[in-house]
């Protein structure tokens, strides 16, 4: 049977469920597919067990169990990630294995916000998940409506505390299990939730609409023509004759792109996703090196000091066998290159164990083009021992 063609007519959005263990994230994911499959026979219902027994994947050497579910509403196509274990969520969010354009925060009305609720909301803020919609689950198990009001207030306060618009974002009250069991009043709440997701999680900006950026992978001298740098265009587009900046390692310089080449053919412009060679005016082979980036003027700047949200690989994942302490000095791998840096541990933390997640302050020995949300790896002698996301730039 031929594979069904991916329908590009509907805009695509990536979402995920977050929240405390046993608050009903996976049950909700299953319930969404069940209710939507009633409206649209093309949508596959995914049972709780099929989502809960998610296969383990390796993302940059880190083992993460993630279930990928897809469904659509009248207006959009969604890819939805759900993780069986708490550690899987942490790894997923920090490594960006599954980028989320928005999250559905699941809180059991029977419990209210719990430690992992807070941890997931904080991480969502740190790694740049931009929008949150709340589903108060298990409302069928709470007889006193005032108790649900209190839980809703607590959730809104928690979101405010971590920089989300807690007073304004939608909170839907429901029962994922009730909906999964086909109870009409709770099925209607799943429809209400998906309407809230449709309305409150905006379409992400497409990579091609963002300012041009290409990490430099290789440099060639072409006699009589000049210097060509190659790499994969990460975002935006670049036209022949455009001025760009070379950012990272040294003083930022301006140059003009005098040629764009792909597969030995000359092009007028290079687009996000293209593996391209760019000919640069007035630049010698020694003026550029791997790890610098070419970018639209003023769109990105070089820095050495930043805060990062980091997951340290466990021994089983091929990470360190021992903890590290203050003054830890590994390599930090950004885009295409390693730069040495020193890590400062949070106040009151003596050491960091393999398998931990931790907020580090890092100072690099040379400046790198960076911005909040950029992912990086931590390496020792070419071996990955950690993964992180920049949560704040200091200097």
Swiss-Prot record:
Residues 82-85 are annotated as: G3. It holds the Pfam family GTP_EFTU_D3. The keyword Nuclease does not apply. It is found in: Cytoplasm. Residues 137-140 are annotated as: G4. Its EC number is 3.6.5.3. GTP binds at residues 19-26, 82-86, 137-140. Coiled coil: none annotated. Residues 175-177 are annotated as: G5. One of its GO terms (molecular function) is GTPase activity. It is an enzyme of class 3 (hydrolase). Transmembrane segments: none annotated. Residues 10-205 form the tr-type G domain. Keywords: Cytoplasm, Elongation factor, GTP-binding, Hydrolase, Magnesium, Metal-binding, Nucleotide-binding, Protein biosynthesis. It comes from the Bacteria. GTP hydrolase that promotes the GTP-dependent binding of aminoacyl-tRNA to the A-site of ribosomes during protein biosynthesis. This is Elongation factor Tu.
């Amino acid at each position: 049977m031929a594979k069904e063609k991916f329908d590009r007519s509907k805009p695509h959005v990536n979402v995920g469920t977050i929240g405390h263990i046993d608050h009903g994230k996976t049950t909700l994911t299953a319930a969404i597919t069940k209710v939507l499959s009633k409206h649209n026979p093309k949508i596959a219902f995914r049972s709780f067990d099929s989502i809960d027994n998610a296969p383990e994947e390796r993302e940059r050497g880190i083992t993460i169990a993630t279930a990928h579910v897809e469904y659509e509403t009248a207006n959009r196509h969604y890819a939805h990630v759900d993780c069986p274990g708490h550690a899987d969520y942490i790894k997923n969010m920090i490594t960006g294995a599954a980028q989320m354009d928005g999250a559905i925060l699941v809180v059991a009305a029977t419990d209210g916000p719990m430690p992992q609720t807070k941890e997931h909301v904080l991480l969502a803020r740190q790694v740049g998940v931009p929008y949150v919609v709340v589903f108060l689950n298990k409302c069928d198990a709470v007889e006193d409506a005032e108790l649900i009001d209190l839980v809703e207030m607590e959730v809104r306060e928690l979101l405010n505390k971590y920089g989300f618009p807690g007073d304004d974002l939608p909170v839907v009250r429901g029962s994922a299990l009730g909906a999964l069991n086909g109870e009409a009043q709770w099925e209607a709440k799943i429809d209400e939730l998906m309407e809230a997701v449709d309305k409150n999680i905006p379409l992400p900006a497409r990579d091609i609409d963002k300012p041009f950026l290409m990490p430099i992978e290789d440099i060639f001298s072409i006699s009589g023509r000049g210097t060509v740098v190659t790499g994969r265009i990460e975002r935006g587009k670049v036209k022949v004759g455009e001025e760009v900046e070379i950012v990272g390692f040294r003083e930022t310089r301006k140059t003009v792109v005098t040629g764009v080449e792909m597969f030995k053919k000359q092009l007028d412009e290079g687009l996000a996703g293209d593996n391209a060679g760019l000919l640069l005016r007035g630049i010698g082979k020694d003026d550029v090196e791997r790890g610098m980036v070419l970018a639209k003027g003023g769109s990105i700047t070089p820095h050495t000091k930043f805060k990062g949200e980091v997951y340290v690989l466990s021994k089983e994942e091929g990470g360190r066998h021992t903890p590290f302490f203050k003054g830890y000095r590994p390599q930090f791998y950004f885009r295409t290159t390693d730069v040495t840096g020193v890590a400062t541990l949070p106040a009151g933390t003596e050491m960091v164990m393999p398998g931990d997640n931790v907020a580090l302050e890092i100072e690099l020995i040379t400046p790198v083009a960076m911005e909040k949300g950029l992912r990086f790896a931590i390496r020792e002698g070419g071996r990955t021992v950690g993964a992180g996301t920049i949560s704040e730039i200091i200097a």
